[in-house]
């Protein structure tokens, strides 16, 4: 199945962080926090401005990003894996290698 986000929406696959504490102890279950890093799988056409123009998004497919997981972030299943659908404004940074 293919999902195409609309407008300023972005589809992200979460990149799971290793569940270790600062002291090197492996955390289990609820002690491990979900990662807020992911890879952009698809982007919408852009944000519609008040004057009707469309502003292209700053992120592109393949970008590694840090995002804010909060109100408005939707989790969906895509080909058996969880993906996140969120607005570009929920993306805090692009991680450059």
Curated annotation (Swiss-Prot):
InterPro entries: Chaperonin_GroES, Chaperonin_GroES_sf, Chaprnonin_Cpn10_CS, GroES-like_sf. GO terms for molecular function: ATP binding; metal ion binding; protein folding chaperone; protein-folding chaperone binding; unfolded protein binding. GO terms for cellular component: cytoplasm. The keyword Nucleotide-binding does not apply. Keywords: Chaperone, Cytoplasm. It is found in: Cytoplasm. Its main location: cytoplasm. GO terms for biological process: chaperone cofactor-dependent protein refolding. Together with the chaperonin GroEL, plays an essential role in assisting protein folding. The GroEL-GroES system forms a nano-cage that allows encapsulation of the non-native substrate proteins and provides a physical environment optimized to promote and accelerate protein folding. GroES binds to the apical surface of the GroEL ring, thereby capping the opening of the GroEL channel. Heptamer of 7 subunits arranged in a ring. Interacts with the chaperonin GroEL. Belongs to the GroES chaperonin family. This is Co-chaperonin GroES. It comes from Aeromonas salmonicida. The gene is groES.
